[in-house]
Amino acid sequence: MANALVWFRNDLRTIDHEPFLRASTADRCFAVHCIDPRQFETTELGFQRTGPFRARFLIENLTDLRSRLRSLGGELIVRVGRPETVLQHLLPSLAIDAVHFHHEPRTEEADTAESVQQLCDQHGIATHVAYGDTLIHPDELPFEIADTPELFTDFRKEIEKQCEARSPLEEPIRIHGTLPEEVNAGDIPTLESLGLSTPPLDDRCLNQFTGGQNAAQQRMEEYIWNEDRLRVYKETRNGMLHPNDSSKFSPWLAQGCLSPRMIADHVRRYEEERVKNKSTYWMIFELLWRDYFRWISRKHGATLFRAGGLRGVNVDWKSDRELFRRWQDGTTGYPLVDANMRELRTTGYMSNRGRQNVASFLTKNLGIDWRWGARWFESQLVDYDVASNYGNWNYAAGVGNDARGFRFFNITKQSRDYDSQGEYAKHWLPELRDLDVTEIHEPWKMSPERQQEVGATLGKEYPHPIVDLFDSAKENETIYMRAKAASH
């Protein structure tokens, strides 16, 4: 009798899941997810590596996955512990012959997988590793992973010319996975047991993310088909306020309740049944960005996380805790930055447009180590994934392969361009709700009398700008260019 174990990682789904599909043909198919306590440690900056929003989403995802596996005849074993330690005890208890899991192209996760591989080798247990978190399967890449083009444009052109995404795999019809009496399925942890508090509800939160494959599929149906928003995705994707400005698939992608191929399959059908346009192309374009960061992460490994980034530009970053705290709290005096940072802290989400602006401000105006920002995003974002997060921060800080040198965002211009009426800023900054359109983007230009009239006195209800936008950029450009010259 052959017994197989599926080690679920950041792939919490039953559809388009090669390890699960292969394991389902065994006489008995078991499944486990390990909540690694290292992911909940406190960083040297004083906050937890995984904050309450992502942790709550994980709990919901595991609850949904357990329910789905039970409906198929199986069970999800949940353990808190390092995977290699958990499996050391679990493999003999279940008399496992083969372990099936997805590869994750990231340094820390790869080290964990190697430890599991060694454990299985020691016990004569077969391991089967598959790839499932990219749009294009590595077997179909027109280059070796070690030869992944350094620039996204080169990567994209080669992929578009030669590759097509595979269709998603079907879900197994039935599995035989009843646990032996001596093996307990284990409880899915609570936020409290993970050392976290339940985040308070805030009626300003317009984006509701419920974990699980079922909720992910409902979101695809709603966004693509029911609301027909894919048709205008390219035009609306930079919006920051409304739930359907962009797809909001990213939380489910990050923890693997959706695969990129599941999304691409819907896009293909949409193009056949409704329309093929720039927006449908752009949805696939964004998934290719995601692929790019994954293969670059695998190619360069730990280099992605060093201060000098992929390009080795060793900028003399500041370590100013007070400036960093003001950025975290959304009290910089720049409404676009502050609104986005308060949304992040209140909801665990921020638009892509917002992320670009706050990252630019932290690195190009405050001159603070980009890795501090990356770690804060890791802690707060419900859709955090390591390759995209650190890849994008490399880019924003000017230390990534695709970075354009010292390119900084004019925050006030961005505010006018993407929040022209100030709706988003006023939504998250109620102290500025009575400012008119001419004032909301630069409140520091109001006269003292006008500040008092609208209840937004600078230094009292709303802060003065903590730096001058252009003077600070000029100062940090000098520091950056010096480091760039030294790196050649």
UniProtKB/Swiss-Prot annotation:
PROSITE patterns: DNA_PHOTOLYASES_1_1 (PS00394), PHR_CRY_ALPHA_BETA (PS51645)
Function: May have a photoreceptor function. Binds DNA; probably functions as a transcriptional repressor.
Name of the featured protein: Cryptochrome DASH
Residue ranges of every copy of the Photolyase/cryptochrome alpha/beta domain listed in the record: 2-135
Gene coding for it: cry
Pfam families named in the record: DNA_photolyase, FAD_binding_7
Essential cofactor(s): FAD; (6R)-5,10-methylene-5,6,7,8-tetrahydrofolate
Alphabetical keyword list: Chromophore, DNA-binding, FAD, Flavoprotein, Repressor, Transcription, Transcription regulation
Gene source species: Rhodopirellula baltica (strain DSM 10527 / NCIMB 13988 / SH1)
Keyword check for Repressor: yes
